[in-house]
C-alpha cells in the first residue's frame, strides 16, 4: 500500500462465502484502524449471550436506565476477548477513544460505561468483547485471497439493522447479493 487513501479504516469487511474460519464465517467487521503496521476491527453481527447489565454488574457500575441493560454484548473478535470495546455515535471523545469517522468512534475506557450507567452515554452504541486483528500485510493478503469483500461503512448497518441482517445489508451497500456468491475463488 503506497498511500493512506488505500487503507480501509471506516470500511466494512464482509466475509465471503468461502471464509470458513468459525470466528469469521458470515461476519461483518468494521475496520477501526488500518495502517502499514496492520489493522484492528470489531465484528458487528455476532451477539453473545451476555447483556450490558452483565458487564455493568461485573464492573460494579450502576445502571440507572434499566432498558439499556438488555442491550446485547457482541463477540468483537478472537483477540483479547476479555477487553471491552464500544462503537458509538456520535464520535464523542472519552479517556481512551479512537475516532473512526466524523460520526463514529471506538472507546475502551471505563468512563463511557459510567456515563451510560448515569443515562448520559452515547445516543447509539455497540458493546463488544474482543477484536479482530491483522499484522502487517495480513489483511491485504486475505483480501487478495478472496476472503473478504470490502465496502464503505454505514452507521445504519451497525445501529439500525438487526444483527442477523447485517451481513446481507453490508454487501448490499456495494450492490452484491451475497447469497449468489460462490465459495470458489477465481484465481486460476
Swiss-Prot record:
GO-annotated cellular components: cytosol
Q: SUPFAM superfamilies given for it?
A: VC0467-like
Residues annotated as coiled-coil are none
Q: What InterPro entries has UniProt attached to this entry?
A: AlgH-like
- The disulfides recorded in the entry are none
Q: Which Pfam families match?
A: DUF179 (PF02622)
- Which family, according to UniProt? Belongs to the UPF0301 (AlgH) family.
Annotated protein name in UniProt: UPF0301 protein MCA2336 2
Organism, by scientific name, is Methylococcus capsulatus (strain ATCC 33009 / NCIMB 11132 / Bath)
Amino acid at each position: 500500500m503506497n498511500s493512506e487513501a488505500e487503507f480501509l479504516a471506516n470500511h466494512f469487511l464482509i466475509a465471503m462465502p468461502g471464509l470458513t474460519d468459525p470466528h469469521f464465517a458470515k461476519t461483518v467487521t468494521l475496520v477501526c484502524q488500518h495502517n502499514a503496521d496492520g489493522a484492528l476491527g470489531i465484528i458487528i453481527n455476532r451477539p453473545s449471550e451476555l447483556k450490558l447489565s452483565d458487564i455493568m454488574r461485573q464492573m460494579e457500575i450502576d445502571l440507572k436506565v434499566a432498558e439499556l441493560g438488555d442491550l446485547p454484548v457482541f463477540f468483537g473478535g478472537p483477540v483479547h476477548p476479555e477487553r471491552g470495546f464500544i462503537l458509538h455515535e456520535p464520535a464523542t471523545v472519552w479517556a481512551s477513544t479512537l475516532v473512526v469517522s466524523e460520526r463514529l468512534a471506538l472507546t475502551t475506557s471505563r468512563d463511557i460505561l459510567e456515563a451510560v450507567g448515569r443515562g448520559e452515554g452515547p445516543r447509539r452504541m455497540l458493546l463488544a468483547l474482543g477484536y479482530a486483528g491483522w499484522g502487517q500485510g495480513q489483511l491485504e493478503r486475505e483480501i487478495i485471497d478472496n476472503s473478504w469483500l470490502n465496502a464503505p461503512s454505514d452507521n445504519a448497518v451497525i445501529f439500525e439493522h438487526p444483527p442477523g441482517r447485517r451481513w446481507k445489508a453490508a454487501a448490499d451497500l456495494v450492490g452484491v447479493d451475497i447469497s449468489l456468491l460462490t465459495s470458489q475463488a477465481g484465481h486460476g
